[in-house]
Amino acid sequence: MAGKFVQYGRHRKRRNYARISEVLELPNLIEIQTKSYDWFLKEGLLEMFRDISPIEDFTGNLSLEFVDYRLGEPKYDLEESKNRDATYAAPLRVKVRLINKETGEVKDQEVFMGDFPLMTDTGTFVINGAERVIVSQLVRSPSVYFNEKIDKNGRENYDATVIPNRGAWLEFETDAKDIVYVRIDRTRKLPLTVLLRALGYSTDQSIIDLLGDNEYLRNTLEKDSTENTEQALLEIYERLRPGEPPTVENAKSLLYSRFFDPKRYDLASVGRYKMNKKLHLKHRLFNQKLAEPIVNSDTGEIVAEEGTVLDRRKLDEIMDVLESNANIEVDELDDSIVNEPVEIQSIKVYVPNDEEGRTTTVIGNAFPDSEVKCITPADIVASMSYFFNLLHGIGQTDDIDHLGNRRLRSVGELLQNQFRIGLSRMERVVRERMSIQDTDSITPQQLINIRPVIASIKEFFGSSQLSQFMDQANPLAELTHKRRLSALGPGGLTRERAQMEVRDVHYSHYGRMCPIETPEGPNIGLINSLSSYARVNEFGFIETPYRKVDLETNTVTDQIDYLTADEEDSYVVAQANSRLDDEGHFISEEVVCRFRGNNTMMDRDKMDYMDVSPKQVVSAATACIPFLENDDSNRALMGANMQRQAVPLMNPESPFVGTGMEHATARDSGAAVINKHFGRVEHVESNEIKVRRIIEEDGQQYDGELDTYRLAKFKRSNSGTCYNQRPIVKDGDIVSQGEILADGPSMELGEMALGRNVVVGFMTWDGYNYEDAVIMSERLVKDDVYTSIHIEEYESEARDTKLGPEEITRDIPNVAESALKNLDERGIVYVGAEVKDGDILVGKVTPKGVTELTAEERLLHAIFGEKAREVRDTSLRVPHGAGGIVLDVKVFNREDGDDSLSPGVNQLVRVYIVQKRKIHVGDKMCGRHGNKGVISKIVPEEDMPYLPDGTPIDIMLNPLGVPSRMNIGQVLELHLGMAAKNLGIHVASPVFDGANDDDVWSTIEEAGMARDGKTVLYDGRTGEPFDNRISVGVMYMLKLAHMVDDKLHARSTGPYSLVTQQPLGGKAQFGGQRFGEMEVWALEAYGAAYTLQEILTYKSDDTVGRVKTYEAIVKGENISKPSVPESFRVLMKELQSLGLDVKVMDEDDKEIEMADVDEDDVNEHKVNIQQSSIPESQKETTD
């Protein structure tokens, strides 16, 4: 028997077919969100306040400092926030110090800086009552990048770009005449030497001494018309500020503010790290021949002679000397912008492959401290030097799609950037107020205006492209959404501009980003998912874990190192499935491994690292597909994406054939209830679980506090499905920390359960499964196998209008008593009432405009008092196609002191309607291998084909859907699933390390089935056996969110577009069916003239005709002839607006009068057509 039993959680054992032992536990799958937010609260906020303080006034007398901050208690807890449509947030209070330097007076005060949204334990935010997720953004890391490009003559040219976190870009490029230019902040280009002169290298000779003599530099100096620092500064000023009179002082301050002012230019710590790494000498000296000796300046010892070729070993030897102080030059510059000497490190080497033996200078930036967040003149000089080195064939260009050059901005950093914007706006206000107000009586509270800060945070959570409404279709969708990486958004790419290369899978994605899970369509490759073991380091680069190989003994150790993409480039990594002996030596002489982008075989003693797990390549959702290794990648992509669209079923069931990931994904998704402390279950109810903590001290156990966990019961999720939690522990159970106490939606016994295990046969049946259609047994409808619960929310507000307040009431004009049967005395529907489309949920009347009364009416009014109120019915009704049972009603009143209502709203009523949807013809189903189809027929159980023991099968799939799509995984799942069912076990087949063919066949034989997995089937209608044996087995099938009930739509009359008077389109607008150009041709081809006429007139935009037609149908008369369609009039008006005189003639060349339709003409025949089901915002005009 292959495989061994493994326990997943408390309740589930699976036979696991993995051969590779797990060295590393899966990390917490949502830590990318929670860790980043914790960093923001602990360090990010402090960093912000440090950056901005002190704020000084223009005279430098007053100074405002931010000392410390604290977060208070949230106003509402999580549940309350969701119910009240409030934001789950805590007040941020900042301790501020105002110092008056003249008088020496110091004032401390705590200032409220607005409510700050808090992250929930599950990595989401509750904003205005809705759960939202902040998606991490993939952006280019700030650094210096070198590119190679081929010009139109086929010559190699280079360009370089210095990209900061914020601030001006600096670009170098060459042209056809071998002149090197620089661009500052995307302006017109200048010769590169102009910038060098401006930095203080004023003479030609000092520039040549600095960069080394070469033809590119000579050409550039010839092109350069400036001769000293002053001229260079004026030249730059004229380029950056054309039209302004240049002065040397202005030019200096401009250049300083562009690059050397920490408030305007910021590399961030990651930029400094990347910059120092790129401009380090070691990468350029590798394999180069020295043209001067390298001397240890402390001892005077020569560590490398002139003429030495620096291979890896020699470089490692001299590394310490290089990094301490070798060859560091300190240039004291005259008239420099930055008043510090420029420290650089320079070494001369011979130009490679040069017969004349010319030399070039390699300059490094002498590694500035990591605290230096600005660019330094040394950085600029070293970047220029790297550029000249590239022109001589020294150094490497950068690949922008490499994950060493792309980093993640997670929640914390995105929030910090947004907060910084708010604080800098606030800073301006503070400065202005400092200069206006009286310095003696002023307090910090009076200076600070928190509006810009609150506004920028609100704007980020409410409308940023990266703050998204959480996809809550099922727990897997929720988990994947939190682990999503997007290259779009502010500061990122746009769909239209993104090239093929950005979207492509790159070798550096291995173990960091999933190569499979990405959307189909315009976002392909721009939105990705984090791999299962990946984590994000302090600089925002994605790291993946590897097992270290001990180089002395050549054994694979259990030491785990996390490597970023550019660190990994220096090592050879063996695959996770390389075979090892008991000591951890590689068994084969040659091992399959990866080095940079190449997959090769190498000697086993060359290995540096080994993968920790075969599933480290793929994301959490992809790792849930069994037999992934037997599926084509395109279908696997669909499989991974469609699992996220599975609807939570009423009776979920975890798969017989899983991958062992079901428990981890369910636990970390946020849908389950997780135990926080080791303890004993004391009390279990359907809506709460109580756990008594157990504290261990000196080997003794004591009872601690009692924790209460509330369960969500039949709540509405973001996607309108039912969110319900069920306990899976019982009284007296001892539960460990992190254990699942209650299942969420789409979970069973602590495992993800998106669908059901059903018996499937691959066979055709009267052509009903043509084109991937699915034939289903009626048993699945009868036994509620694929029944799901859906909850819709409807709300009605009573507002104050100009004519008086709206009122929620049972007293509605012109409505029959029968229509009010479900309303209580307040005019609100009862809980438990069954409603269908058009029924009133909340009775509401709105005051109409009061008309001027006649003298008689005024007299009657004076005698009899109140005249009958003029109100119109604006009740909330059930929209078309909806309906169900009223699950809950929530009423919020302003009188009850409900301050969460928006201004102008007196009362808010929310009604929740629940529907139990059985599966229908037209619903979409799928497996986990991208095999999707629509149900075409539901066959009575007795007519379904049956197995030899009389069991009817549940679903028939078309066998033609398998070969061309190459997703063979579904066939293996089918056979193994049948064996698991017969043996009464659950199995796990992990991706890339699962059951192989022999395992599947041996398990089939163990279950007493035929070795080929096929069986004789009998036709349920005739009882005859089918000609050939058929593959029958158990497959895990999901019901997808694309349900026919949501798509079916019909219209009789409804809203019309204002200009063309044609019906609107789409279900949401209650629109009509488009009869387009080609459909017109079809009717013309049939000669169906009258049918075509009524489609183009009454049923479309003949405004008068359609009203008369309606009237005629109601009265039972004949329908009159149509008049002119409105769109024809629109065309005429368009032509007339161009100044053309347009007339319409009949066949006798007589002019036809085109009278404008008068409102009264239409109103005369007006028929009141009920259109309550159209939302106010979508009503344009109605007949």
Swiss-Prot record:
One of its GO terms (biological process) is DNA-templated transcription. Its EC number is 2.7.7.6. Residues 1155-1183 are annotated as: Disordered. The keyword Transcription applies. It catalyses: RNA(n) + a ribonucleoside 5'-triphosphate = RNA(n+1) + diphosphate. One of its GO terms (molecular function) is DNA binding. The RNAP catalytic core consists of 2 alpha, 1 beta, 1 beta' and 1 omega subunit. When a sigma factor is associated with the core the holoenzyme is formed, which can initiate transcription. This is DNA-directed RNA polymerase subunit beta. The gene is rpoB.
